[in-house]
Each structure stands twice: as C-alpha cells, then as structure tokens.
Regions:
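Helix-rich catalytic cores of soluble enzyme domains
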Residues: 1-3, 14, 21
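Gly-rich Lys/Arg/Thr-decorated short loops/hinges at beta-loop-alpha junctions or inter-strand turns
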Residues: 6-16
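Alpha/beta catalytic cores of nucleotide-metabolism and tRNA/nucleoside-modifying enzymes
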Residues: 19-50, 55-177
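Non-cysteine beta-strand/loop elements that form the S-adenosyl-L-methionine
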Residues: 1-8, 73-74
Length: 177
C-alpha cells in the first residue's frame, strides 16, 4: 500500500518546517492516476491510503472519490471520549529533538467513538456520523461500493464550503464555523 499525505494532519507541522507538501485532494488524485497507469501496465494494483486532514465526513468522501482505497483518521478518533489522550492528539510526526515537526494539540472530547463513527450526530459540522456521511455521499453519487467511488466525476469549486451558506457563515453554525 502507498500512504499519501505530507503535512495535512491536524497536529503536523511538516509543511511549515520543511516547506514541502501538496494539498490532500491533489496528492490523492495524482497518486491514483499513477497507480492506475501502473496497474494497466503491470497488472499489479497498489492500494492508496490517504492520511491527514480527514476531519469530516466530506473529507473522507472526497478521498475515496479521488482514488483512495482507505483513509487514516487521527484527530477525529482523538476526540472520542474513550480515547487515551483525554482530548489531546499527537500526530504521526511527533516532536523530535533533531527535527521537530509535529505537535500535541488539544482537540477536546466531542462524543463517543460510536457517535463519531455511526451517530447520531450531536453537532452540525460533519465531524460525527462519519459512516453515515460516506453512505449518503455514495448513494447521492450512485456508487454501490468504494471502488465505484473512484469513478465518480469530480468538479472543483473554489468556494464549495461556503457557497450559498451566507446565513451559516453569519450565524457561525454548520459550515460557517
């Protein structure tokens, strides 16, 4: 498997420290394109794991639509009441004396692991019921499985998070937070 993601995680500072990194959607699409080319030439399929920035259901859905076969989730699980960090998250690139490029961040405890994964959601920002978001997105796109998510059409809209959300932004609710 190929792990994709340099610096998009909530606790990671790699992009700032090293000055490298590619936005997560772009990195996943580029890796999936190369993987598919390699698969056609050799018959060998290399699964892609998108790692970093998977905070909301929409982030996970976009990763699969861009070609990921799996995602790694860190800060969302760190927010679970059962998490051993008690509201704190240490990224994969934890602090090191030779090249510090990660930090410990406070993410709080927003719900149980069950609520974060399966709901019911108690917040309106997409950070709970991650599986419900994935199932709804797949249904809306006509994808019966994750492999079919790789074939959906992707359109990049610069203001997709806030487009038409004037009241949410004004009242700081939902996607306006």
């Amino acid at each position: 498997a190929l792990l994709i993601g340099v610096g998009p995680g909530a606790a990671c500072t790699t992009r700032g420290v090293l000055g490298i990194g590619v936005p997560q959607v772009t990195a996943t699409v580029d890796a999936a394109t190369a993987r598919d080319f390699y698969h056609k030439r050799t018959g060998k399929y290399i699964p892609i794991i998108t790692d970093g920035g998977m905070n909301r259901g929409g982030d996970i859905c976009k990763a699969f639509a861009c070609g990921a076969d799996a995602v790694m989730i860190g800060s969302s699980f760190a927010r679970a009441k059962e998490a051993p960090g008690r509201g704190y998250h240490w990224g994969m690139a934890t602090s090191h004396v030779n090249l510090p490029r990660g930090t410990r961040i406070y993410v709080g405890a927003t719900g149980s692991l069950k609520e974060i994964l399966f709901g019911p959601a108690k917040v309106d920002d997409g950070s709970q019921n991650l599986m419900g978001a994935l199932k709804t997105s797949m249904g809306s796109l006509g994808a019966a499985n994750l492999k079919q998510m790789h074939d959906v059409e992707i359109i990049i809209a610069p203001s997709i998070q806030t487009e038409g959300k004037i009241f949410q932004v004004d009242q700081r609710v939902g996607m306006g937070k």
